[in-house]
Swiss-Prot record:
Protein name stated in the entry: Acetylglutamate kinase
Similarity section: Belongs to the acetylglutamate kinase family. ArgB subfamily.
Record-annotated site: Transition state stabilizer: K36, K249
Protein's organism: Synechococcus sp. (strain RCC307)
Cellular location(s): Cytoplasm
Amino acid sequence: MSLEPAMTTPDVLRVEVLSEALPYIQRFRGRRVVIKYGGAAMVREDLRDAVFRDVALLASVGVEPVVVHGGGPEINQWLNRLSIEPVFQEGLRVTCPDTMDVVEMVLVGRVNKQIVNGLNRVGGRAVGLSGADGGLVQARTHGDGSLGLVGDVAQVDPSVIIPLLDQGYIPVISSVAPNHEGQPYNINADTVAGELAAAMDAEKLILLTDTPGILRDRDDPESLIDQLSLSEARELIHAGVVAGGMVPKTECCIRALAQGVRAAHILDGRVPHSLLLEVFTNSGIGTMVLGSRQQG
């Protein structure tokens, strides 16, 4: 009879997972990772909890996560309560002054605090900010102004969040920012995350979405492209393989990579713990686009 202690299959799997993760933990310790949090992962309670635990774990092993969020579903709920009709053009919310008041209230006053509380509850040390705080983000009017108070990023100054990261805090940033006159603007959270990642010289930009990643055939989830170069990503847009709502997300990744971010990831936030699966495993789970610095 063997006197060696028995290990069950789940025990062995846990050890294998930890062993596989160790080189990635060592590699990314002290590196900055900007995470755009949105989609189903904000709506379903089980997915919210998984994201909070993933982000808190990243911070606990020495990675420096920054969370940027939108809050579309809750904004729509409040607009409906106030009898304000949500209007969209080309995927962007038309934002009149009344709508802007609701957007700011929901993103800064409600969603941001919910995320901060959720991260703190699972052991993180989160701090809530908006683009206005410390002059973090300055906005400018998007396009010709026909969408109202919809903005683009004019400037990013990450100096307010660097000391927070140095002290082990997790900055949580809502995508509302003022222009040079102090007028608040509603900015797409993907855009804010990408520009912030570039300004911070981040290791990674991660977009949590409601799709598996970039697909060669948008109707076939099995056609997931797990890795692309910067030039290949541009070619897929030009060829129409990347289309619809995936175009602005891919373009956001391309802009960030062109400004020095080493890798950008488009992940399925509907998969529990997709963040950890992508960052700390060999196979990953979504699409990774590599910048020229990473390829070199």
